[in-house]
Amino acid sequence: MTAIPPQLIVEPDDGLEPVHAFISSAQRSLLIKQFTFTEPSLIAATIARRKAGVDVRVMLNAQRSGGDRANDDTYQELKHAGVDVQWSSPHFYVTHEKSIVVDEKAAMVATYNLMIKYFTLTRDYGIITHDPVHVQQIIDVFNADWGHREFTPAEDGGLLWSNSNSRYQMARFIDKASETLHIQH
């Protein structure tokens, strides 16, 4: 069986379509964890999946570090449509993660929020992976955060998790560079 290669999404070049298509591809389950989720067509796609019988859970960051609450309207709209939605874990100052998991088989991790400006004005990236180890780890963290439980990542899980292993893993990655290292921040 051939592994499905990762799909890179480059914004603003690729626009909304790859994200919309990914959300719309969910047949059994859809997990969305977002720092900011206000883009109307993506909210509608999420609600459409719920209306199609998909088990949808959405976790939103309650407020930004400055105190503004960008997700309140989205929270209410999703809740009203029957989507299982809740605020992210209070264990963290903010939840800055941007992830979407479809059918427990594929995960999108991105630097962009689900807001129109990230698909039209800013340089951001996303990747869709089918790597079962990575997908499962994203699900495990989602479930831990959903239940407000601690999560300790595996040392070599392949993913970096802030407040856990990110500094160690990032330093290890940088140390492995033998000729070049390109960083965009």
Protein language model features and the residues they cover:
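HKD-type phospholipase D/PLD-like phosphodiesterase module
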Residues: 1-27, 33-178
